[in-house]
């Protein structure tokens, strides 16, 4: 018999390498939440290996925080987690406390990723951006536009985007597609601006 998931049932994500290798963190099961699988995460961080150390990262549409926690474990300088759902954002904060992360290393902002990115910036902030939005809402393209329009990206920033498989993605002309793979129902790509 299949177990019925309640909204506050807990799953977990595993950190696969770095300072907290093998550590498992609780994740609330929430509608639309799809933590990035270990194989995809391992491939992504193999791509990012030369760049992640001391980088400033944005985990947009953070959800489980799987990508941001992995970046912190691999010694990113700072990760900003954006999460709209207050309960999920609170779980991210608890996990950061469990890992003993300071506010200089990580912050959780309980706000829509798109609303956050609408704020124009005087100076760019991020070396690496993770975008893994809920599927079927075209949120990735909206977030990409806002990242560029509002000066969030440092020169040569790396932008990781997860979308539904076979969904064409419109990106700025000056972005270079560095890597692309598909698995199951997911396409994932790494760009550089």
Swiss-Prot record:
PROSITE patterns: N6_MTASE
E.C. designation(s): 2.1.1.171
Pfam family, one: Cons_hypoth95
A Gene Ontology molecular function term of the record: 16S rRNA (guanine(966)-N(2))-methyltransferase activity
Enzyme class name: transferase
Keyword flag S-adenosyl-L-methionine: yes
Record keywords: Methyltransferase, rRNA processing, S-adenosyl-L-methionine, Transferase
Database matches in CDD domains: AdoMet_MTases
Catalytic activity, as annotated: guanosine(966) in 16S rRNA + S-adenosyl-L-methionine = N(2)-methylguanosine(966) in 16S rRNA + S-adenosyl-L-homocysteine + H(+)
InterPro entries: DNA_methylase_N6_adenine_CS, RNA_MeTrfase_RsmD, SAM-dependent_MTases_sf
Annotated Gene3D superfamilies: Vaccinia Virus protein VP39
Superkingdom of the source species: Bacteria
SUPFAM superfamilies: S-adenosyl-L-methionine-dependent methyltransferases
Keyword field contains Metal-binding: no
Role of this protein: Specifically methylates the guanine in position 966 of 16S rRNA in the assembled 30S particle.
Family: Belongs to the methyltransferase superfamily. RsmD family.
NCBIfam families associated with the record: 16S rRNA (guanine(966)-N(2))-methyltransferase RsmD
Name of this protein: Ribosomal RNA small subunit methyltransferase D
Organism: Haemophilus influenzae (strain ATCC 51907 / DSM 11121 / KW20 / Rd)
